[in-house]
Amino acid sequence: MEELDITSVGQFQTLVRYNNPVLVVKHPDKKGGAPLTEIEMKRPQTAGALLDTKRETEEILNSILPPRCWEEDGQLWQQSVSSTPATRQDVINLQEMLDTRLQQTQARETGICPVRRELYSQCFDEIIRQVTINCSERGLLLLRIRDEIAMSMEAYETLYCSSVAFGMRKALQAHEEKEMLRDRVKTLELDKEALEEIIADMKLKQEQAERRNAELRASEEKKFTEEITFLKKTNAQLKAQLEGITAPKK
């Protein structure tokens, strides 16, 4: 079996078709003794050299989808994307596998869903792989589209994170301002109560002053009335005496 199923690639799960993993071994260089890294296949290699077009296609595929490396049991493994052309049945299987994975992972059908986005990205990568094998120019064009979409998504995520951070800062600022306004309202309410007490005290003093003034005015009016009455009486007596003195005797 030259290639793995698209559901079990090494220790990963992906919709992209990969070759069988190969073991990466290190051995000293014959000249300088420095360690060199090369790929040692676990299966016998096919006889003969690869065609230039196939080698070029594999290089393009490796540039689009770089080989994956991981370490297992102290050994380094590497896995490159498959260069086998896809059949119509492979495309149907890819669609079915995508739907199955979407259901298994319970990905959201609408809205923002990282799981759904990852699965569709894997599906798009597999489509790019299939197209690149048949036409490298078309595959590179799809690669540009994929990178543009990824760049746009990163920009949207950055903008979203910035908006969320800005909203949180504004909400925190509004909360702080709200607390400050509450403290200000409490202070103003205390000032209002103090002023109301002052006003009530001043009203009481005003009423007392008006009452004292009314009593004083009534007392003064009574005093003046008595003086006027006394003066009128005295004036009448003096007038009568004056008339008695100045009247001719008979």
Curated annotation (Swiss-Prot):
Cellular compartment(s): Cell projection, Cilium; Dynein axonemal particle
GO terms for biological process, alphabetical: cilium movement; inner dynein arm assembly
Coiled coil: 168-250
GO CC terms, sorted: axoneme; ciliary base; dynein axonemal particle; inner dynein arm
Keyword set includes Cytoplasm: yes
Pfam families (alphabetical): Ax_dynein_light (PF10211)
Keyword match Aminoacyl-tRNA synthetase: no
Record InterPro entries: Axonemal_dynein_light_chain (IPR019347)
GO molecular function, one term: dynein heavy chain binding
Sorted UniProt keywords: Cell projection, Coiled coil, Cytoplasm, Dynein, Motor protein
PANTHER family: AXONEMAL DYNEIN LIGHT INTERMEDIATE POLYPEPTIDE 1, AXONEMAL INNER ARM DYNEIN LIGHT CHAIN 28
Family: Belongs to the inner dynein arm light chain family.
Function text: May play a dynamic role in flagellar motility.
The protein, known as: Putative inner dynein arm light chain, axonemal
Organism: Drosophila melanogaster
